Every structure is written in C-alpha cells, then in structure tokens.
C-alpha cells in the first residue's frame, strides 16, 4: 500500500525565460492514473508560489476523478541536494516541509524527519515553502551578480577584484562571493519562475531581472577581454571545464556554450574529463578534446576548477601555452601576473 508519492522532476524555462512545466504536468498525469483514496502527493521541484495548488492539483483531479483535500492530499518539500558537494548530503541538510492541511503537513513532516538527521522546518503553507525555495537561489544569483558587476567596474579602474574582496572580507559582516559564470539548472533558471509570477501580478521585479541580465552578460565580457588581448587575431583557445559547477558532470545550461559563441571566430577547444563527450555532442556542436597532452594554445581559459585539474594547474598548465600565450582565470584561482589575467 502506497501512502506517499513523491514527484521530483526538472522545471526548466523556455526560450523566452518563461516556466516550462511540461515535465511537472506530465508527471502529475502519470501519478493520477494510480492515485488512490487517501494518497499524499509531495512535490519537490522548484516552482513559483502557488504552482502546486494552481497547476498540479487541477491535473491530479482531472485525470484521477478524485477530489483534492477530500480523497487525496498534497504537500511541498523542496529538494536541497547540492551536486558535487560531499559534505552537505540529503540527510544533513534541514528539509522544509508543508502540506495542504495541518494534519497532512504533520504527516509529511514526520516522514522526512525519519530520514533527515538535520531536522525539518514545517512551513505554514505550501505557497510559503514554494517561495522559500525559489528565493534561496535568487539570493545567491543576486549576490554573485553584484560581485560580477563590481569585477567589471574594477577592471575599468585597473583594480584586482580578488585583492579588493580579500580586503573587504576582513570585516566581520562582509559576505564572501567570487565573480564568475552563472549557469546550471537552478541559480540561473529559478529567478525566472518568481519573475513570471510577479509580472502576472503586475509587479516589476526589476532587481531580480537586473541580476539575471548582469550574470548573463559575463560570457561576452570575458570574450571581449580575451579578444582585446589578442588584438582580435584568430587564435587557438582551450577552455578548461564545461560543467556548470565544480566536481559535477552536469552540463545543463552551461555558460561555456555562450562563451564559445562569443569566441566563434577563433579555434575553440574544450577539455573536461568529467563530461561524457558523446552525450554532450548530441546537443552541442563543440570541439571536445579527450587529451591535451603535447598540445599548444594561445589562450587557456580556466572556467571550472574541478579537483582533477588541481595537479595540472599547479605543475603543467604552462606546458600547454605557446610562448606568448596567456591564461584567463575566470575562477580567481591564480595570482595574476603578466601571463595570467583574472576576472
């Protein structure tokens, strides 16, 4: 006998940056086929406030013939899994829970408490839990956007961003973030779910959208800095890393794709041992290398600092540079010098 059904599917955006709920709706349809009296459906996908009750519940009712909060119930408990993070795993990260009635909310909370060692936080409503999840990623997106904007400004002021941040970080309440590419299926996507809902309510989420605009402009900024250094001469460029974050094989919404487009007049190659090249080539027509041994490049762009790169970056990275070549350090990994430019 199944009491709980958990739905956790991707919630991407479309080409117009609007929520694409197809997978969520399809999953709800499938679940409705097996829905029984008293079942509790828990959604974990990131959505805008109100989505579970406004979109998913009507689908469940329509295709099951059952009535919400009479024959079946719903809850929302957003996933907080951090890919590539070996410290913060499912059981040691606090889980936000919620339910469509007080009794159901307590049952859902009890269910997650049985596996989450860190404990749970029972939100007063499904909409509250939905909003909490989406702003977690919006806050991070905006914080990185601020640092990215400052990095672009400091570039014009001929200041080293890392040194400025290090000095500012000596204050006890300064929040530490680094500039960089913001991709992936969470931070660069979730803000558009809330802005969609905001605009529907005739509210202009200008700060959230401004942060997205800033972060989306980073690939072009980086490409322009590289092209300026090369005097727009057609060059051979290696990008180290393709995934959207360190130590993770996931390349969804990788901003390296945007970066390669901005560098299209050059010979651009990508090396990332964590990526399944055959899988990537199905979606992208990019030049991936299985090995960089004995290869020389005019520019090496350090885009993702996987642990597997550590030894190479420490001992061999310059072996792959031509005599007058340089490194563009997106991740502020190196100390800048004549051959290393930091973002």
Predicted regions mapped to residue ranges:
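Structural/interface elements that position substrates and couple domains in central-metabolism enzymes
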Residues: 1-343
């Amino acid at each position: 006998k199944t009491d709980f059904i958990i739905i956790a599917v991707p919630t991407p955006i479309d080409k117009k940056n609007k929520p694409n709920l197809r997978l969520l709706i399809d999953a709800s349809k499938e679940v409705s086929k097996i829905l029984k009296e008293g079942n509790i459906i828990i959604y974990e996908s990131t959505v805008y406030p109100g989505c579970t009750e406004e979109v998913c519940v009507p689908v469940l009712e329509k295709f099951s013939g059952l009535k919400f909060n009479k024959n079946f119930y719903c809850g929302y408990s957003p996933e907080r899994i951090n890919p590539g993070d070996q410290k913060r795993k499912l059981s040691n990260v606090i889980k936000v829970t919620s339910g469509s009635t007080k009794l159901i909310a307590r049952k859902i909370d009890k269910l997650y408490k049985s596996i989450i060692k860190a404990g749970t936080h029972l939100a007063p409503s499904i909409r509250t839990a939905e909003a909490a999840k989406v702003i977690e990623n919006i806050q991070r997106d905006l914080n990185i956007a601020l640092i990215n904007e400052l990095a672009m400004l400091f570039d014009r002021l001929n200041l080293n961003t890392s040194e400025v941040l290090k000095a500012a970080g000596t204050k006890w309440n300064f929040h530490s973030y680094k500039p960089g590419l913001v991709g992936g299926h969470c931070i660069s996507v979730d803000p558009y779910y809330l802005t969609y809902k905001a605009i529907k309510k005739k509210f202009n989420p200008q700060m959230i959208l401004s942060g997205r605009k800033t972060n989306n402009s980073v690939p072009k900024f980086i490409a322009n800095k590289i092209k300026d250094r090369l005097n727009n001469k057609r060059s051979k460029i290696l990008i180290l890393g393709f995934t959207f974050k360190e130590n993770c094989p996931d390349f969804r919404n990788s901003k390296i794709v945007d970066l390669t487009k901005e560098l299209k007049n050059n010979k651009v190659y990508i090396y990332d041992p964590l990526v399944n090249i055959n899988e990537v080539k199905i979606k992208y027509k990019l030049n991936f290398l299985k090995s960089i041994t004995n290869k020389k490049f005019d520019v090496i762009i350090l885009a993702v600092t996987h642990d597997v790169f550590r030894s190479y970056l420490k001992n061999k990275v310059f072996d792959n540079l031509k005599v007058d070549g340089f490194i563009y350090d997106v991740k502020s990994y190196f100390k800048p010098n004549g051959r290393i430019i930091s973002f």
